[in-house]
């Protein structure tokens, strides 16, 4: 009986990440009431780097804090700078508390912010919103 190969059963094959040389791109900040997700793409929309509050190490209600959004934006910006990113246009979506903090931390890590756009979707009387909380 021939020996089993490792890749067939348990271990995963990991593909080497190639360094993309992109100097200008887009930063998408999705800030919800529960989490903040930062994705940095090239101008065509291919994701170069991303980070979220949960991926940075926060759990539960701490993911929705501005500090968690700051660390997520810094992590995504550092990964994008490894690929040569220098300038980004920022698109912010959602009502969360980490919107402004994430933009500021993108600037603080050395990325030049060209423009800031709010692309939060507005309902044209679509689905019924969730009921009001009674605390």
Curated annotation (Swiss-Prot):
Keyword set, alphabetical order: Ribonucleoprotein, Ribosomal protein, RNA-binding, rRNA-binding
Organism: Beutenbergia cavernae (strain ATCC BAA-8 / DSM 12333 / CCUG 43141 / JCM 11478 / NBRC 16432 / NCIMB 13614 / HKI 0122)
UniProt cross-references to Gene3D superfamilies, sorted A to Z: Ribosomal protein S11
Function comment: Located on the platform of the 30S subunit, it bridges several disparate RNA helices of the 16S rRNA. Forms part of the Shine-Dalgarno cleft in the 70S ribosome.
Compositional bias segments (type: Basic residues): 12-23
Keyword rRNA-binding: yes
Stated family: Belongs to the universal ribosomal protein uS11 family.
Source taxon at top rank: Bacteria
Disordered as annotated region, ranges: 1-26
GO cellular component: ribonucleoprotein complex; ribosome
Oligomer status and interactors: Part of the 30S ribosomal subunit. Interacts with proteins S7 and S18. Binds to IF-3.
GO BP terms, alphabetized: translation
One term of GO molecular function: rRNA binding
Record-linked Pfam families: Ribosomal_S11
Record-given protein name: Small ribosomal subunit protein uS11
InterPro entries tied to this protein: Ribosomal_uS11, Ribosomal_uS11_bac-type, Ribosomal_uS11_CS, Ribosomal_uS11_sf
């Amino acid at each position: 009986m021939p020996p089993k190969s490792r890749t067939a059963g348990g271990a995963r094959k990991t593909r080497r990440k190639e360094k993309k040389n992109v100097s200008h791109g887009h930063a998408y900040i999705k800030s919800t009431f529960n989490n903040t997700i930062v994705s940095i793409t090239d101008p065509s929309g291919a994701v170069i780097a991303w980070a979220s509050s949960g991926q940075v190490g926060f759990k539960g209600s701490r993911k929705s804090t501005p500090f968690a959004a700051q660390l997520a934006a810094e992590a995504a910006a550092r990964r994008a700078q490894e690929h040569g990113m220098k300038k980004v246009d920022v698109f912010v979506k959602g009502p969360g508390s980490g919107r402004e903090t994430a933009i500021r931390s993108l600037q603080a890590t050395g990325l030049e912010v060209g423009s800031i756009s709010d692309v939060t979707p507005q309902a044209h009387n679509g689905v019924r919103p969730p009921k009001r909380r009674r605390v």
